[in-house]
């Protein structure tokens, strides 16, 4: 193939460096970065969940909660399984709402999906709250064991975890 430069001298295309040569490798790099970010986000969420819910939930229940978090992350919020705290300490509705908000914020999911996720995960604890109420009150800042944790811009890490 031939192409013409401003000087009108024909130059073979192979002599011009191909700007698109790295296109595929750049796409692959971006995909790998995204996969790593998603993995790192899920690790941070799991560590946060263990720290914030261990006094309320059994190991088995936390494992179910992990699966439910994967469901919400994969846009399968209706696949969430119910959890019922069997420990003495009961997790409060505000704590559950804040937990849903904090996790959902890291995953970038809608308030509606956060409400469905937490209601599906804790139907007994949230038996007096409907989806609309939960959706509207996820971020209402009331004193409880699990405070709202707003992530820093562009970051998924949680604050105040040991």
Q: What is the predicted role of each segment?
A:
Residues 2-4:
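Short, small-residue-biased leader/transition segments that mark boundaries at the very start
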Residues 7-162:
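Flexible coil/loop and intrinsically disordered linker positions at secondary-structure junctions
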């Amino acid at each position: 193939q031939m192409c013409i430069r401003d000087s009108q001298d024909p130059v073979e295309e192979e002599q011009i460096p191909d700007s698109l040569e790295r296109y595929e490798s750049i796409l692959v790099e971006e995909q790998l970065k995204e996969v790593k970010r998603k993995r790192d986000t899920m690790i941070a969420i799991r560590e946060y969940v263990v720290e914030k819910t261990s006094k309320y939930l059994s190991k088995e229940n936390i494992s179910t909660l992990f699966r439910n978090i994967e469901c919400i992350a994969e846009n399968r919020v209706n696949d969430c399984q119910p959890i019922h705290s069997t420990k003495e300490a009961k997790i409060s509705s505000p704590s559950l709402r804040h937990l849903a908000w904090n996790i959902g914020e890291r995953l970038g999911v809608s308030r509606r999906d956060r409400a469905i996720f937490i209601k599906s995960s804790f139907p007994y604890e949230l038996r007096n709250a409907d989806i609309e109420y939960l959706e509207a009150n996820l971020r209402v800042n009331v004193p409880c064991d699990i405070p709202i944790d707003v992530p820093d811009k562009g970051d998924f890490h949680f604050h105040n975890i040991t």
